[in-house]
Amino acid sequence: MRSLPPGIDQRSPARHPDWLGPDDLSLKVQEVREATDYRIPIQLKLGAARVYDDVRMAAKCGPDTIYLDGAEGSTGAGPHIATEETGIPLMAAIPEARRALEDVGLADDIDLIVAGGIRNGADVAKCLSLGAKA
């Protein structure tokens, strides 16, 4: 995994160790904004699991973009059961993410970018029609 030799442990936590919940994440978003002098957009990446709740929480933390990766996406680290057998398919996740942004009143302020399982132009058209920005 990630080109490590056999016998070497890979640490790949499910979340960044700097935050335990939404309050910490909100502080980290503000910290990054200040560190970059507000010159770069802040993007939060989410795996599609508890889509509605996770997108609502992330949106309230103040990012410019929420990047949603459907179950068809992957990671460079993690056990097979987590990388291949869990998550919500992208096409099912997009409407939930869009609804969450609308419910917190931020659908016009936060771009929803999606990935994972997009195979062709028809899939791109479906994603856009379901509410993704890109």
Task: Show the residue positions of the predicted features.
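Glycine-rich phosphate/ribose-binding loops and adjacent secondary-structure elements
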Residues: H16-A134
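Short glycine/proline- and acidic residue-enriched helix-loop micro-motifs
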Residues: G7-R15
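Flexible, active-site-adjacent loop/turn segments at secondary-structure boundaries
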Residues: R2, A14-P17
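Flexible glycine-/small-residue-enriched beta->alpha junction loops
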Residues: M1-G7
